[in-house]
């Protein structure tokens, strides 16, 4: 049986989106904090060091349906948000905010959500 081109295109599109979605959320997510603001995971496979003393990692707040790319200044005890992605309940992207040119570093407060993550990734 031959499928019309439109049906074939829709099937291929759905397969492609499924693979892309699996790659994004098929990462190595590990819980690092359970706070009043949400349950937080980090993607161990995404940890990168763009320069000496700096580490980047994706985090996911399951409660708020948000993922953020965080950069830590391991020597300075500070961080900045480089990318923020908001999802709906079905996992579709609602909004994306690119802060890659953000020059503002924030101090990591003791007992904050990011303190245990900094300890993990800045070894």
Task: Please report, for each region that a protein language model flagged, where it lies by residue.
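N-terminal secretory-pathway/extracellular module detecting exported/lumenal segments
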Residues: 21-123
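Bacterial N-terminal signal peptides
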Residues: 9-19
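Bacterial N-terminal signal peptides that target proteins for export
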Residues: 1-10
């Amino acid at each position: 049986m031959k499928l019309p081109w439109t049906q074939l295109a829709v099937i291929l599109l759905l397969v492609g989106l499924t693979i892309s979605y699996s790659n994004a959320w098929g990462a190595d997510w590990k819980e690092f904090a359970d706070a009043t603001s949400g349950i937080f995971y980090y993607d161990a496979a995404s940890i990168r060091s763009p320069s000496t003393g700096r580490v980047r990692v994706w985090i996911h707040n399951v409660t708020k349906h948000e993922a953020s790319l965080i950069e830590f200044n391991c020597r300075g005890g500070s961080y900045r948000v480089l990318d923020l992605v908001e999802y709906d309940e079905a996992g579709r992207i609602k909004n994306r905010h690119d802060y890659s040119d953000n020059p503002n570093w924030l101090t990591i407060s003791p007992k904050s959500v990011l303190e245990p993550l900094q300890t993990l990734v800045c070894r």
